[in-house]
Swiss-Prot record:
Pathway it works in: Amino-acid degradation; 4-aminobutanoate degradation
Organism: Escherichia coli (strain K12)
Regulation: Uptake is stimulated by ammonium sulfate and abolished by 2,4-dinitrophenol. Is affected both topologically and kinetically by phospholipid composition of the membrane. In cells lacking phosphatidylethanolamine (PE), the N-terminal hairpin is inverted relative to the membrane and the rate of GABA transport is reduced by more than 99%.
Subcellular location field: Cell inner membrane
Keywords associated with the record: Amino-acid transport, Cell inner membrane, Cell membrane, Membrane, Transmembrane, Transmembrane helix, Transport
Role description: Transporter for gamma-aminobutyrate (GABA). Transport is driven by the membrane potential. Can also transport a number of GABA analogs such as nipecotic acid or muscimol.
Top-rank taxon: Bacteria
GO biological process, one term: cellular response to nitrogen starvation
Catalytic activities: 4-aminobutanoate(in) + H(+)(in) = 4-aminobutanoate(out) + H(+)(out)
Name of the featured protein: Gamma-aminobutyric acid permease
Family, as annotated: Belongs to the amino acid-polyamine-organocation (APC) superfamily. Amino acid transporter (AAT) (TC 2.A.3.1) family.
Gene: gabP
Length: 466
C-alpha cells in the first residue's frame, strides 16, 4: 500500500450518524448476551444492583473522559491525557495495556462467531471460519475509517433493534397481555429466596462480572477524533450515556429476572435471553439468539480491530512505539497498526495451540483487570487535568459533576474493588496477572527512553494525533 503524502494525519471519514450510532450501541457488548446469565446465577435478582453500580461507574468515567476529550480531542484519548496529567510513563503504560486488551478480544470474539457458524455448517472447521472473519474485517478496516463506521453502523443498529424488541416482548408478558405463554407479573424478583438470595458479597462479585460488558463505551471518544465535529459528538454521547445504560442494560436485565427464576437449571448453559424467548414460546429461539450473538461479536471484533490500531497509531505518534506504526495509506488509515494488531491477535492463537496451557491462561487473565485500571487512570488524569487546563487558560466546556469530590469518590471505589478482587479466589489471578503485565510494561520505560532519547517520566504537552 502506498503511503500518503501526509503520513501522520488520519482521515475524518466518520459521519455524524456513524458516531451517533457508535455512541448508542458502544455500551452494548457481546457479553451482555453471552455472560449476563453468569452474573444472574451469582447474585439472583439483585444482579440489577450490580448492573446499576457498574453503570453508574461508567457514567462517571465517561463524564470525566468527556471533559478532557472536549477540551483536546485525540485519537489516543485517555492515554494521551494520562501522558499530560500524570506523566509519559502513565500514558505509555495504559496505552499499551489498552492495546493488549483489544488484541486479546479479537481472537476470543472471532472464535465465538466461528463456533456459531460451525454449528450451522459443520463441514467447515472452526479455525477456518475464525480466520476468514478476522481477515475480512481486517480488510474492511484497512480500506478507510468510513468503512469501519458504515459497517459498525448497521451492526449496531441490529443490536439496538434486537434489544428493544426483547424489552417490548418482555414488557407485554410482564403486563399479562402476552397470549402465547402463561406468564405475568414480577414475582420472580423475590419468590426464590428473596431479592438478594446470596447476600451483598454476591452482588459485588456479579458487578465484577458485568464490568466487562461496559468496556467499549469509551471508544466513541477515540472515533469522534476522526469526525468533522468531535466536540459535538463527545458531548452528545456523554449526555445520553445514562439513558443508554438504563434502557439497554437495566431494562433488559429486569425483563430477564422478572420472567425466569434466577436459579433455573441450565441457565448458564442456555443463556438468559434465550431462556426468556423459550419461556415465551418464541419459535427458533436458539437460532434467533445465535444470530444476535453473531452480530454482536462481529461488531465487537470490528471495534477491537479499529480501537487497537488507533491506540497503536497514537503511541507511535507520541514516540512510545516504533515510528513505522504511525504510517498511513492513501485513504488515511494506519495500515501498519491495523496489520500489526491483527498479527498480534493471531500470535495469541498460536500460543493457545502450541504453548503450555498456563501460558495462554496468563495472557487471558492479564486482561481481566485492565478495564478497572483504565477507569482509574481516567479518574486520576481528570483530577489533575482540570488544574492543567485552567493554568493554560483553556475553556472547559463540559465539566465533571461535584469536582473534585465525586472524582475522589470514584478513585476510592475503583481502588476498593481492585483490593477486593485481589482477595477473592475467582478474580485474584486476574489482578495479579494484570499487575505483572503493567509492571513489565513500566520496566520497558528506561529502554524506550534510551532508545528514543526521551524523558518518559515527565509530563508533556498533548499532541493531537488526529
Amino acid at each position: 500500500m502506498g503511503q500518503s503524502s501526509q503520513p501522520h494525519e488520519l482521515g475524518g471519514g466518520l459521519k455524524s450518524r456513524h458516531v451517533t450510532m457508535l455512541s448508542i450501541a458502544g455500551v452494548i457488548g457481546a457479553s451482555l448476551f453471552v455472560g449476563s446469565s453468569v452474573a444472574i446465577a451469582e447474585a439472583g435478582p439483585a444482579v440489577l444492583l450490580a448492573y446499576l453500580f457498574a453503570g453508574l461507574l461508567v457514567v462517571m468515567i465517561m463524564r470525566m473522559l468527556a471533559e478532557m476529550a472536549v477540551a483536546t480531542p485525540d485519537t489516543g484519548s485517555f492515554s494521551t491525557y494520562a501522558d499530560k496529567a500524570i506523566g509519559r510513563w502513565a500514558g505509555y503504560t495504559i496505552g499499551w495495556l489498552y492495546w493488549w486488551f483489544w488484541v486479546l478480544v479479537i481472537p476470543l470474539e472471532a472464535n465465538i462467531a466461528a463456533m456459531i457458524l460451525h454449528s450451522w455448517v459443520p463441514g467447515i472447521p472452526i479455525w477456518l471460519f475464525s480466520l476468514v472473519i478476522t481477515l475480512a474485517l481486517t480488510g474492511s478496516n484497512l480500506l478507510s475509517v468510513k468503512n469501519y463506521g458504515e459497517f459498525e453502523f448497521w451492526l449496531a443498529l441490529c443490536k439496538v433493534i434486537a434489544i428493544l424488541a426483547f424489552i417490548f416482548l418482555g414488557a407485554v408478558a410482564i403486563s399479562g397481555f402476552y397470549p402465547y405463554a402463561e406468564v405475568s407479573g414480577i414475582s420472580r424478583l423475590w419468590d426464590s429466596g428473596g431479592f438478594m438470595p446470596n447476600g451483598f458479597g454476591a452482588v459485588l462479585s456479579a458487578m465484577l462480572i458485568t464490568m466487562f460488558s461496559f468496556m467499549g463505551a469509551e471508544i466513541v471518544t477515540i472515533a469522534a477524533a476522526e469526525s468533522d465535529t468531535p466536540e459535538k459528538h463527545i458531548v452528545r454521547a456523554t449526555n445520553s450515556v445514562i439513558w443508554r445504560i438504563s434502557i439497554f442494560y437495566l431494562c433488559s436485565i429486569f425483563v430477564v429476572v422478572a420472567l425466569i427464576p434466577w436459579n433455573m437449571p441450565g441457565l448458564k448453559a442456555v443463556g438468559s435471553y434465550r431462556s426468556v424467548l423459550e419461556l415465551l414460546n418464541i419459535p427458533h429461539a436458539k437460532l434467533i439468539m445465535d444470530c444476535v450473538i453473531l452480530l454482536s461479536v462481529t461488531s465487537c471484533l470490528n471495534s477491537a480491530l479499529y480501537t487497537a490500531s488507533r491506540m497503536l497509531y497514537s503511541l507511535s505518534r507520541r514516540g512510545d512505539a516504533p515510528a513505522v506504526m504511525g504510517k498511513i495509506n492513501r485513504s488515511k488509515t494506519p495500515y501498519v497498526a491495523v496489520l500489526l494488531s491483527t498479527g498480534a491477535a493471531f500470535l495469541t492463537v498460536v500460543v493457545n495451540y502450541y504453548a503450555p496451557a498456563k501460558v495462554f491462561k496468563f495472557l487471558i487473565d492479564s486482561s481481566g483487570a485492565i478495564a478497572l485500571l483504565v477507569y482509574l487512570v481516567i479518574a486520576v488524569s481528570q483530577l489533575r487535568m482540570r488544574k492543567i487546563l485552567r493554568a493554560e487558560g483553556s475553556e472547559i466546556r463540559l465539566r465533571m459533576w461535584l469536582y473534585p469530590w465525586l472524582t475522589w469518590l470514584v478513585i476510592g471505589f475503583i481502588t476498593f474493588v481492585l483490593v477486593v478482587m485481589l482477595f477473592r479466589p475467582a478474580q485474584q489471578l486476574e489482578v495479579i496477572s494484570t499487575g505483572l503485565l503493567a509492571i513489565g510494561i513500566i520496566c520497558t520505560v528506561p529502554i524506550m527512553a534510551r532508545w528514543k532519547k526521551l524523558v518518559l517520566w515527565q509530563k508533556t504537552p498533548v499532541h493531537n494525533t488526529r
